Amino acid sequence: MNTNQNTNLKEITMYTDGACSGNPGPGGYGVVMLYKGHRKELSAGFRDTTNNRMELLATIVGLETLKEKCNVNLYTDSQYVVNAIEKGWAKKWRANGWMRNKKEPALNPDLWERLLKLCEFHNVKFNWVKGHAGHPENERCDQLAVAAAKQPNLPLDVR
């Protein structure tokens, strides 16, 4: 994570959420991006995925959508995502060959690698928000994610 905010960069506010029915099961992600009065919403669904993969993918897709380096205030209800980045867990897992400890592999290394690279490019500040607590943008992300997970003929997860 690059927390040195550059005042010459665009300031993006991003909300993300993932949802999964069954865990594993069909899942989806939702993203709401805000910039100077503009709004962009993104969502997609996959079959046979997990909630954590969808939380990660929401964050990744949102950041990958940005066409240039930006300052990003990212809000998610996923403590998994926030803690792994803010507490440095994901970087430690990568340094240890994607192992959480000597016996347990870290889950979702494909997605963590993508997210870490994006965080090295953008200036991202991760913020945790309580899910299902009435925050309008977080609620919208949840609606997008749940609706995406219910679509017919979902593709396989992006593993």
From Swiss-Prot:
The keyword Metal-binding applies. Keywords: Cytoplasm, Endonuclease, Hydrolase, Magnesium, Metal-binding, Nuclease. It is found in: Cytoplasm. Its EC number is 3.1.26.4. Mg(2+) 1 binds at residues 17, 55, 77. Binds 1 Mg(2+) ion per subunit. May bind a second metal ion at a regulatory site, or after substrate binding. This is Ribonuclease H. It comes from Desulforamulus reducens (strain ATCC BAA-1160 / DSM 100696 / MI-1) (Desulfotomaculum reducens).
